Amino acid sequence: MRADWIAKRRGQANVSQMHYARSGVVTEEMAFVAARERLEPELVRAEVARGRMVIPANVRHPELEPLAIGITACCKINANIGNSAVTSNIDEELAKLRVCLKYGADTVMDLSTGGDIPQIREAILRASPIPVGTVPIYECLAHVKDVADLTPELMLEIIEAQAAQGVDYMTIHAGVLRDFIPLAAHRITGIVSRGGALMAQWMLANKAENPFFTHFEQICEIFKRYDVTFSLGDGLRPGCLADASDAAQFAELKALGDLTRKAWEHGVQVMVEGPGHVPLDQIPMNMEKERELCSEAPFYVLGPLVTDIAPGYDHITSAIGAAVAAQHGAAMLCYVTPAEHLGLPDIDDVREGIVAYKIAAHAADVARHRPGARDRDDALSRARYAFDWNKQFELSLDPDTARAKHDETLPHEAFKSAEFCSMCGPKFCSMKIHGHLAEAAAAQDAAANGAAGKPAGGLQVLP
C-alpha cells in the first residue's frame, strides 16, 4: 500500500518520519495512523516531531501498514520470533508470523541467531504487514568465530544491509559502556541481555569502548536514509527482582537518554527499551525515570516480570507488570511466553504470549481512557447478558479458545443459544434470573403506572 508514498521520496537524504514532521509535513503514514488511532493528523505530526511518537516504517518495506507507538496512541505489543543456533526452519518462523498476525501482535522481531539469517529475515519481511525489528549484533556474530573478532566496519555493514532489506526498527545496544560493566558485578544474575553481554565481552577483550556508542553518528546516517527507528537496547536490564532499579540499570538509562537526543539531532526516530524484572511497587517509578532521563521518548518494555518463581507461567508474571507499566506510560510491551527462561518458544507459546499481552495492553488502554478502548468490552458484555454465545466468541481476543472451552461441556449447536452455561445450569444463572426479575418488574410498573397515567419506573435494564 505504501509503494506510491515511498516513490515520492526517492533521492532524498533524510526520509524519516521525524524529519518530515519537523518540516511541517503530514505524511501519508501519519494520516493513516491518525485514522487508526482516532487522533487528529496534526497531533500525530506534532508528537512525531517532538519524539514522543514513532512510526517505524522503512522505505524498503512497502508491504507495511503503518502504526504509531507513543503515549498518545493505544498501547502496542511486540512478539518475538526467529530461530536459535540449534534450530533453523523458515517455514516454522513464517507459521509463527501467521500466528502473530492472527492474534493481533502489532510488531514482530526476528531474533534469529542461526542458519541463513538474511534469508529468514527476507521471508518474514515480505510476508509481514506489521513493522519488523531485529537485533543486528546477532547476525554480526554469525560472521566471526569469536565476539572479540567483531569490527566496527562489519557491524555497520550488517546494519546497512538489514536497513536496505527493509527492517523497520533495530535494537542497538549503544548504552552499555565500559564504565558500567563493574556496576553489574554485584548482581545475582549479572548481565542477562544477550546483546548487552556480547558487547561487554567485546569491550573487555578489546579494551575499547562499545563500537555501537563510538560509531553512533554513522548509524544515525544509515537510519535516516531508510527511515529505520532506533530501539535503544537495555543491555543492563535487571534479570531478577533483586537486581531491579540498581546503579547499572539507571546508568545505562541515562546514557540512552543522551543517545536519544543525539539521534533526534539527525531527525531519526527513537524508542527506548526497558526492564526486565521489577517488583510491582517499583514499576511506576521506573516509568517516570525513563520519561525524565529520555525526554519522553516512547518506552518499550519487556514485561516486566513481577516475580521470579513461576517458570512456565512467565507470560502471566510479566503480563501483570506489563499492564501496570502501560498504565503508567509504557508505549509498547514486548511479550513474554510460557517458554521464557526454559527454551525456544513454539507456536502455542507464541499464541499464549500474544493473548496475555493483548489483555495487558487493552486493560491499560481502558484505564487510560483511550478513545473507543472500552467499546469491545461493552459489546461483549451485552452479548453475554443476551446469551448470544456466538457473538461472545467473535468479540473475544481468542475466539478459538473461547468456543473450545464452551464446547467442552456444551458442544451441540443448540447450546449456542441456550440461556445458561455448564457452570450454573438453567436454574442458577444469575443473569437469567435478573432478566426475569426485570421483566416482571417492568410488567408490574407498566400495569400500575399505566392505570394511573404515569410513566413507568421500577427496575431499569440497559440493552
UniProtKB/Swiss-Prot annotation:
Enzyme's top EC category: lyase
BP terms from Gene Ontology: thiamine biosynthetic process; thiamine diphosphate biosynthetic process
Record's GO cellular component terms: cytosol
Disulfide bonds: none
Cofactor annotation remark: Binds 1 [4Fe-4S] cluster per subunit. The cluster is coordinated with 3 cysteines and an exchangeable S-adenosyl-L-methionine.
GO molecular function: 4 iron, 4 sulfur cluster binding; carbon-carbon lyase activity; zinc ion binding
Binding site for Zn(2+): 277, 341
Residues annotated as transmembrane: none
Keyword Transit peptide: no
Positions contributing to [4Fe-4S] cluster binding: 421, 424, 429
Keyword 4Fe-4S: yes
EC numbers on record: 4.1.99.17
One Pfam assignment: ThiC_Rad_SAM
HAMAP family, sorted: ThiC
Protein purpose: Catalyzes the synthesis of the hydroxymethylpyrimidine phosphate (HMP-P) moiety of thiamine from aminoimidazole ribotide (AIR) in a radical S-adenosyl-L-methionine (SAM)-dependent reaction.
Name of the protein this chain belongs to: Phosphomethylpyrimidine synthase
Originating species: Anaeromyxobacter sp. (strain K)
